[in-house]
């Protein structure tokens, strides 16, 4: 949505600028890692970091490997477990944020009756204490799952909800022995320990308020090497009762008090997987959805081009721009579908295909906003020059679309726990809102112009017909923005986690309906009032009257190329 052809709007051609933006976007993709997440933070001072959110089905698994954690703590601070992870099951579409909580409250100290798992890192005793809250039977064990060969093939989603495979994965004897080893005596060798070598007794007093009724907490080993700490664990969703949307967060409560933050380094790998692949529950149907919608947009574009070829006398440049928009939208959805296919099968996208998706998405967004604004202003249909106000609108919308697409690519390629992830997400929302409001101004100005001209220029019938058409188009644009920005978000919040893909279905269906209605309203037909060019000005009318009265034009005819073909005077 960032780059556009401004030819016809000004005298410059931004080809060099466009390729510069594309080069910048390609370089931005270097950190893209798909659903196998790798996050490295250096000198971080945030107290709470939202690492990731994922929807799990039965037999889904979560693997977390903290390979490096370097803290700048004093000896007194090492005695308290104020650093760790939290895993919670969140409501679908909800946004978890710790920015507004009390600065003196630590999420690792709270008790909860809801589904919650805390991993408390005890630096002094070199152990990780696991506390569970709520009714749950999550299977948590140290280490990572053994790597299995990646299964190729398209994902096979079950849009109705949970997969039909309801059998439960039971822990293997090896995993059970690993859990028992956690309760044996520690084995320490010098200053270097590893999670497999350092074990502590799990005989602890239970939490003061534990709704789950567990008598003791599970303990995992914590490795220590060169002033850094490491450990790993994996979780298996073993029953349908444990399915849902899970949110994983990292907390450093030593930095909760403003002005007393201490920098720390963090390197973590997160691997999330469902039985069908690496996609979240809400993303599994998107592969087929984007493929079907791509075919629908392509079919609509082919039909539109055939209409243009049959009405060559009534076709303007804006009609071909609309055809280019539909084709670009189709190609963008195709690359998006292929991108999800490889993410599901391999855990990460193919970088070249991801770049093509971002480029086509960029062009599609630019063509969309430019086409809506040009139709609303009447360019190419009624006039070939834009007013100063309309030029200012394009001067605002086009740079904002560049910024919006940069924000979109940063969000797609960065990890959720990156320090600037939230900032770019807010920029995308704000810029998109401004662009949606800006494209309405040309339509409103055209409506006012037609209202003023309907009773003054002698062409009341034509202007009233155009006014009615512009009002319909204004309502169409409002409905398009309303459905794709507001209703879609409300739907995403309301539906369960496995139905989150309905958000994308509503957005793409609304876009297709908007394209079809726009093409129907402004099709190159002779009786379309929008395509009827304005008649001669008053001076031409007076000259025509003089020539007619003098008999000079007797037997002559004048041919005008208008939207209704050839007109005989």
UniProtKB/Swiss-Prot annotation:
Location (main, coarse): Golgi
Top-level taxon of the source organism: Eukaryota
InterPro entries: GOST_TM (IPR053937), GPR107/GPR108-like (IPR009637)
Keyword Metal-binding: no
Biased composition (Polar residues): 180-192
Signal peptide: 1-34
Disruption phenotype: Deficient mice are viable and fertile and exhibit normal Mendelian segregation, however deficient mice exhibit increased LPS-induced mortality. TLR-mediated pro-inflammatory signaling are increased in embryonic fibroblasts and macrophages from Gpr108 deficient mice. Depending on the AAV serotype used, 10-fold to 100-fold reduced expression for AAV is observed in Gpr108 knockout mice following retro-orbital administration.
Tissue: High expression in spleen, lung, stomach, large and small intestine, and thymus.
Annotated glycan sites: 59, 111, 182, 226, 230
Disordered: annotated segments: 144-219
UniProt-listed Pfam families: GOST_TM
Any one Gene Ontology BP term: defense response to virus
Ranges of compositional bias, category Basic and acidic residues: 194-203
Residues that span the membrane, as ranges: 289-309, 318-338, 362-382, 393-413, 427-447, 475-495, 499-519
GO CC field: cis-Golgi network membrane; Golgi apparatus; Golgi membrane; trans-Golgi network
Subcellular location: Golgi apparatus, cis-Golgi network membrane; Golgi apparatus, trans-Golgi network membrane; Golgi apparatus membrane
Protein topology in the membrane: Multi-pass membrane protein
Keywords, sorted A to Z: Glycoprotein, Golgi apparatus, Host-virus interaction, Membrane, Signal, Transmembrane, Transmembrane helix
Family of the protein in this entry: Belongs to the LU7TM family.
UniProt domain comment: (Microbial infection) N- and C-terminal domains are essential for mediating AAV transduction.
Role according to the record: May play a role in intracellular immune modulation by activating NF-kappaB response and attenuating Toll-like-receptor response.
Name listed for the protein in its UniProt record: Protein GPR108
Lineage: Eukaryota, Metazoa, Chordata, Craniata, Vertebrata
């Amino acid at each position: 949505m960032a780059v556009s052809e401004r030819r016809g709007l000004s005298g410059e051609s931004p080809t060099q600028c466009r390729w510069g933006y594309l080069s910048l976007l390609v370089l931005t993709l270097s950190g893209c890692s798909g659903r196998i997440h790798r996050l490295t933070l250096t000198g971080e001072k945030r107290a709470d970091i939202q690492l990731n959110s994922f929807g799990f089905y039965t037999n889904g698994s979560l693997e977390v490997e903290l390979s490096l954690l370097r803290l700048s703590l004093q000896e007194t601070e090492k005695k308290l477990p104020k650093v760790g992870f939290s895993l919670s099951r969140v409501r679908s579409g909800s946004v978890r944020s710790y920015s507004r909580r009390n600065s003196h409250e630590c999420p690792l100290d709270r008790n909860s009756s809801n589904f919650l798992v805390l991993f408390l890192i005890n630096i002094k005793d070199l152990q990780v204490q696991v506390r569970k809250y709520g009714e749950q039977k999550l299977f948590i064990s140290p280490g990572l799952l053994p790597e299995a060969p990646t299964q190729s093939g398209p994902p096979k989603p079950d849009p109705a909800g949970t997969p039909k495979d309801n059998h439960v994965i039971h822990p293997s004897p090896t995993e059970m022995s690993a859990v028992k080893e956690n309760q044996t005596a520690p084995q320490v060798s010098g200053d270097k320990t590893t999670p497999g070598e350092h074990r502590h007794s799990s005989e602890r007093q239970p939490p003061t308020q534990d709704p789950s009724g567990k008598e003791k907490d599970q303990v995992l080993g914590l490795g220590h090497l060169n002033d850094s700490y490491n450990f790993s664990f994996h979780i298996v969703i073993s029953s349908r009762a444990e399915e849902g949307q899970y949110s994983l967060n990292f907390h450093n409560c030593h930095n909760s008090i403003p002005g007393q933050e201490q920098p720390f380094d963090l390197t973590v790998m997160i691997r999330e997987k469902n039985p069908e692949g690496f996609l979240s529950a809400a993303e599994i149907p998107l592969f087929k959805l984007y493929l079907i919608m791509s075919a629908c947009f392509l079919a609509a574009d082919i039909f539109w081009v055939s209409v243009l070829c049959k009405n060559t006398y009534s076709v303007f440049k804006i009609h071909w721009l609309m055809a280019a928009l539909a084709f670009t939208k189709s190609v963008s959805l195709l690359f998006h579908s292929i991108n999800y296919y490889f993410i599901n099968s391999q855990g990460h996208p193919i970088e070249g295909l991801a770049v093509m998706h971002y480029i086509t998405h960029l062009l599609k967004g630019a063509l969309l906003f430019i086409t809506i604004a040009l139709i609303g202003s009447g360019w190419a249909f009624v006039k070939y020059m834009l007013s100063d106000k309309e030029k200012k609108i394009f001067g605002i919308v086009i740079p904002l679309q560049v910024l919006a697409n940069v924000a979109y690519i940063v969000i797609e390629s960065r990890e959720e726990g990156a320090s600037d992830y939230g900032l770019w997400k807010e920029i995308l929302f704000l810029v998109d809102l401004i662009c949606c409001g800006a494209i309405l101004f040309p339509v409103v100005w055209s409506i006012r112009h037609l209202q003023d001209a309907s009773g003054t220029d002698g062409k009341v019938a034509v202007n009233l017909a155009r006014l009615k058409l512009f009002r319909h188009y204004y309502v169409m644009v409002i409905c398009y923005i309303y459905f794709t920005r507001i209703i879609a978000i409300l739907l995403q919040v309301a539906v369960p986690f496995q139905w989150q893909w309905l958000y994308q279905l509503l957005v793409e269906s609304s876009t297709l309906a908007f394209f079809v209605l726009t093409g129907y309203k402004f099709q190159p037909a002779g009786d379309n009032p929008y395509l009827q060019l304005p008649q001669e000005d008053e001076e031409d009318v007076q000259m025509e009257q003089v020539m007619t009265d003098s008999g000079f034009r007797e037997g002559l005819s004048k041919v005008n190329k208008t939207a209704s073909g050839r007109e005989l005077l």
